[in-house]
Design a protein with these regions (language model features):
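Residues at beta-strand starts and edge strands
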Residues: 36, 77-79, 146-150, 161-163, ...
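A generic secondary-structure signal for well-formed alpha-helical elements
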Residues: 9-13, 158-160, 183-192
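A mature extracytoplasmic/lumenal domain signature
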Residues: 44, 56, 154-158, 171, ...
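A short, structured loop/turn motif at beta-sheet edges
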Residues: 45-47, 143-147, 171-175, 187
Length: 193
């Protein structure tokens, strides 16, 4: 349930690139509404992708979630991830980008609050036959250089469409993202958005 899922919290000191980069990645625990885990890879100086294994030691399991610690293995994957960067000041790294659930993502700038999430792709919305929800299934995150934007590649899958995405995200007063996508039809689609 919602209360139990909210009681599982990522440990900030476990953030990827913690203490070595202005950017940090934090991860979301699989479960609750997020039944399709994603595989996350990072690409650093070696230019070779490294798969990030799920590790329950990255999370605090408080309250009603305390009995769940250790029940998820390293093959499980994560529900998604968020990116932190010192937008407001150098002492604190703000969350400014989130990839979580289906093909949803959202961004925020300095002194802003999140609004509605964007989607990588919407298929057959508001049709009698029902909507199809594509999912980002795999991510490759390029470790950014100092002062440069962060680049995220994503694989999108659904019964009707496969896709590849590139997000170049620049955190700032007005955080910006440049999105490139390549879509491949597997079946007929009535409505694409």
């Amino acid at each position: 349930d919602y209360t139990t899922y909210r009681s599982i919290r990522f440990k900030p000191e476990q953030s990827l690139w913690h203490g070595v980069n202005d950017y940090e990645l934090q991860f979301f625990h699989p479960g609750f509404l997020y039944e399709y885990p994603v595989t996350i890879h990072t690409i650093g100086e070696s230019n070779k992708p490294e798969r990030l294994a799920f590790n329950s030691d990255m999370f605090n399991y408080d309250g009603s979630a305390s009995g769940l610690a250790g029940l998820t293995d390293e093959k499980s994957g994560f529900a998604g991830f968020r990116v932190h960067y010192p937008i407001k000041n150098e002492e604190y790294k703000d969350e400014f980008a989130v990839f979580l659930g289906a093909s949803y993502f959202r961004l925020v700038g300095k002194n802003q609050v999140y609004g509605i999430s964007a989607r990588g792709l919407a298929i057959d919305t508001a049709l009698a036959k029902g909507e199809e929800f594509p999912h980002f299934t795999e991510f490759w995150v390029i470790e950014p250089s100092e002062g440069k934007p962060i680049t995220v590649y994503a694989r999108l899958e659904s019964p009707s469409v496969a896709g590849a995405y590139k997000f170049v995200i620049q955190p700032d007063i007005d955080t910006s993202v440049k999105v490139e996508s390549w879509l491949f039809a597997r079946d007929d689609v009535s409505k694409l958005g």
